């Protein structure tokens, strides 16, 4: 997958050319696309005409539907039940969906998918808590600008960690072309679902983007991929290895459910 930004310069050709030159990459559209940035994302879709996309934005999903492009409902659409799957399939010809990470094993088992519909699940990713158009760095690490402008959106790349009065830490992260976001200090890591529900799910997904880590040491992505591949092959040792590599992680949402 190739994750597209939330904000674009006037020229979107570099993204269009990248996707055209690498047709194996599946465009991944973000949830927040406002005004001209939404129009830019539509332009990329029209220029590239990919076979398949992942969209966390229903506007892009509708555009893909009208163009006859296969689309998958992204994890930020937070799909939790059979009715949502059926609605997306019948109204927008959705080809599949990431199931919500907030539902537990029993709730997932009760979901009935439409015919010819894929079910996907993210087993490793940063836990996003909030995205805002407000700058979070002015009152933390400091910034001279009074508010976010177009230049900030395109060039600013910062991350830091804050701790509240209860001693709980949160990670603030700003990517180039993205809005400032706050993440849980723990990564979501659910290896249990691989043995629980592998027969019900078509694809497992891991998010290796460097977000939500604050000032922590970056993980070896090649080693992470290797261990996850071994996990999916049914080996037991990778569970121990992954917990050793990803020190701060949780799957409490999967255990508790809605």
Language-model segments: residues:
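Active-site pocket-lining/capping segments in soluble small-molecule metabolic enzymes
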Residues: 1-258
